[in-house]
């Protein structure tokens, strides 16, 4: 009988592994570790941090936990009331090889099973039987689920429904546009946060993060949508990518007063996160 299974391989799972000095088995439904700390690699283009943009932390214990990181330097702005103002006083932690490396490094020498999506969790006496999407099964004394709330609830509601019913907890979506230009926008900015905007939430110039891993002839931007825009479009975004890309780029170019022509777009794609971040006050 195995001891402890951890479902998910994001920061929560990595943190648990750091503090619990035991042999643990990790199961990840994707082809790699990281969770929302995700980096898109595009051949002959470069890297997009299309999940976590940066970590804001002054905690020395947390930095010790990370071990391998760097600080994102540059000019950061907030777009508010139709103007750009300085966004000061933050130390933004990133990884120069893509933010996925922040988590990936923490799982070195760990027992990780990839492409293993948990389908069902059943109590068998004093133990739990895990059934995966590939119909394989494993048994453990303890199972810890670090997946987003709704996914964790769906897997455990037969045991925990009365507990979860106490909380008003929800997770919100996000749409993330990745675009590479063959001509610089000449903004000379590292990132912009958009306050109370109908379409945009955040934009990062990837060239200011990982200069050595990006095609020198291209300028890469990751542009995240506002919550309002995400809620409106998350369920149909796969069928509407060209229109959403056009709308987000139009909003971006209008607000920042840059001219973006279609023939200047070398690469573009949009990714939807159904469970991007939490909004709750009870837990």
What is each model feature region?
Residues 34, 141-190, 260:
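Central helical "cap/lid" subdomain
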Residues 2, 133-142:
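Core beta-strand elements of the Rossmann-like FAD/NAD(P) dinucleotide-binding domain
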Residues 114-129:
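A conserved short coil-to-beta-strand element within the FAD-binding core of flavoproteins
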Residues 32, 218-283:
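Conserved flavin/dinucleotide-binding core of flavoenzymes
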Residues 198-199, 204-208, 214-227:
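A conserved mid-domain beta-alpha-beta active-site/ligand-binding segment of alpha/beta enzyme cores
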Residues 19, 38-79:
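N-terminal FAD cofactor-binding segment of flavoenzymes
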Residues 54-60, 84-105, 236-244:
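Short beta-strand to alpha-helix junction loop
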């Amino acid at each position: 009988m195995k001891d402890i299974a951890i479902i998910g391989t994001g920061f929560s799972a990595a943190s648990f592994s750091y503090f619990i000095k035991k042999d643990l088995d990790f199961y990840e439904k994707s082809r790699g570790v990281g969770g929302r700390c995700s980096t898109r690699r595009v051949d002959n283009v470069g890297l997009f941090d299309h999940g976590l943009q940066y970590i804001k932390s002054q905690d020395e214990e947390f930095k010790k936990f990370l071990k391998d990181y760097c600080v994102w330097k540059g000019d950061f702005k907030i777009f508010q009331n139709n103007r750009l103002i300085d966004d000061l006083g933050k130390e933004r932690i990133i990884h120069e090889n893509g933010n996925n490396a922040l988590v990936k490094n923490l799982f070195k020498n760990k027992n990780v099973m990839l492409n293993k999506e948990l389908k069902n969790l059943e109590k068998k006496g004093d133990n739990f039987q895990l059934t995966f999407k590939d119909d394989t099964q494993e048994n453990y004394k303890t199972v810890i689920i670090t997946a987003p709330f709704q996914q964790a609830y769906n897997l455990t509601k037969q045991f925990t429904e009365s507990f979860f019913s106490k909380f008003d907890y929800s997770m919100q979506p996000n749409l993330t546009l990745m675009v590479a230009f063959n001509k610089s926008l000449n903004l000379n900015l590292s990132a912009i946060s958009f306050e109370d905007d109908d379409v945009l939430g955040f934009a990062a110039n990837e060239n200011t993060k990982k200069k050595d891993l990006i095609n020198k002839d291209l300028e890469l931007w990751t542009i995240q949508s506002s919550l309002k825009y995400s809620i409106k479009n998350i369920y149909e975004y796969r069928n509407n990518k060209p229109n959403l890309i056009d709308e987000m780029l139009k909003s971006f170019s209008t607000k920042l007063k840059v001219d973006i022509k279609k023939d200047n777009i070398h690469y573009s794609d949009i990714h939807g996160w159904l469970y991007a971040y939490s909004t709750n006050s009870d837990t």
